[in-house]
Amino acid sequence: MNDADASIQIQQMVRFIRQEAEEKANEISISSEEEFNIEKLQLVEAEKKKIRQEYEKKEKQVDVRKKIDYSMQLNASRIKVLQAQDDIVNAMKEEAAKQLLKVSQHGFFNHHHHQYKHLLKDLIVQCLLRLKEPAVLLRCREEDLDIVESMLDDASEEYCKKAKVHAPEIIVDKDIFLPPAPSDDDPHALSCAGGVVLASRDGKIVCENTLDARLEVAFRNKLPEIRKSLFGKVGAA
């Protein structure tokens, strides 16, 4: 082989090697581009999924917030309704207390005065029947003292007939009286609309039969009926 043939053969080998290198480089480039596109697509899909999850999370948070807000508004409305109902019921109770106070007011022209005397006697008898003690201590308002003392014999006699026992010893406490009637001058002071409180001599058994206590008991017992009558259904106490 002469130099010319050798040169041609070398050039052919160089072209072959260069062509093969270019093909390999092209394959690598195509493969890299495909891998890049796949990786890019995966990143895009991952970001899309992340955005969707974030949106769903925010949407759920909004729904929960809406439900909480609605529940709070509903509860606030219910509280307002219940408060309004309580205000009406309490206003009725206050009016009943005012009317009850008229029963125990003294005065010649007070047509309730005679009724109050008999009411005091009934309250005393009721306490005696509950206590069933041979000796009791009685407390009343200072302004009711004369009426109470005038009724003791009748009350004791009626108790004896009903309980079939001997007359008890009734000691009227003239040192400590029940609070006076409510006054506009001091509306927050302790007050009593009338009635009596009887206790055993040792003070262990007490029967509170004031008009205030009776009103409280009657009102508490009748409260479901009052609410049903006013609001059409039994409300919360």
Curated annotation (Swiss-Prot):
Domain of life (superkingdom): Eukaryota
Cellular-component GO terms for this entry: plant-type vacuole; proton-transporting two-sector ATPase complex, catalytic domain; vacuolar membrane; vacuole
Subcellular location(s) per record:
Vacuole membrane
Q: Is Transport one of the keywords UniProt gives this record?
A: yes
- Pfam families the record matches: vATP-synt_E (PF01991)
**UniProt subunit comment:** V-ATPase is a heteromultimeric enzyme composed of a peripheral catalytic V1 complex (components A to H) attached to an integral membrane V0 proton pore complex (components: a, c, c'', d and e).
Protein name (database record): V-type proton ATPase subunit E3
Q: Which organism is it from?
A: Arabidopsis thaliana
Gene name as annotated = VHA-E3
